[in-house]
């Protein structure tokens, strides 16, 4: 209500077993008023909605760097610019950040440029392999029939850069 949101979704999961205990997708609907409703409300946003995850995806970029032993929490990235250009795209920071940040600070301060630098260190193949090992880029199997497909794309240096901070790479909230 405070933000005038028109929809949302949430999943309650058992962290030990991975079992889905509950999921909700809003807005919901009243079947007594089904003829006066927008058809979009019948979409389960958890399983069928495909979205860019944005800055949440930086955790996967950092995890890929840690998993491949290319970074640690204290690895310092020096001379981070507040914006960089990749082909026709400009990547920038939301806020002005210090020029030197370690891995932990990149996550805490949500640095787009820091995430790009980590992804560049990882490289396309290792990054793709890491995401595939988590099945983030694949359609999931689930008890409900309505499950969305992550959007396929061609990898390149700019896709690696934007994917590192969750842009241009899509998946369902359930994934």
Label each PLM-derived region with a short phrase:
Residues 8-55, 60-175:
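Beta-lactam-recognizing serine transpeptidase/beta-lactamase-like catalytic domain environment
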Residues 1-4, 46:
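Short, basic/aromatic recognition patches
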């Amino acid at each position: 209500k405070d933000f005038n949101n028109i929809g949302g979704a949430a999943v309650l999961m058992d962290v030990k077993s991975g079992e889905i205990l509950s999921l909700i997708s809003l807005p919901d609907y009243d079947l007594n008023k089904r003829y006066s409703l927008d058809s979009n409300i019948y979409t389960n946003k958890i399983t069928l909605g495909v979205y860019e995850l944005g800055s949440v995806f930086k955790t996967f970029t950092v995890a890929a760097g840690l998993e491949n032993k290319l970074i640690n929490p204290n690895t310092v990235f020096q001379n981070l610019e507040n914006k960089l250009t990749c082909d026709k795209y400009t990547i920038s920071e939301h806020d002005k950040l210090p020029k030197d940040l370690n891995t932990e600070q990149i996550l805490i301060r949500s640095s787009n440029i820091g995430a790009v630098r980590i992804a560049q260190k990882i490289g396309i193949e290792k990054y793709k392999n890491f995401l595939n090992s988590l099945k983030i880029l694949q359609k999931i199997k689930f008890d409900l029939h309505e499950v969305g497909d992550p959007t396929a794309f061609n990898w390149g240096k700019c896709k690696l850069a934007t994917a590192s901070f969750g842009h241009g790479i899509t998946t369902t909230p359930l994934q």
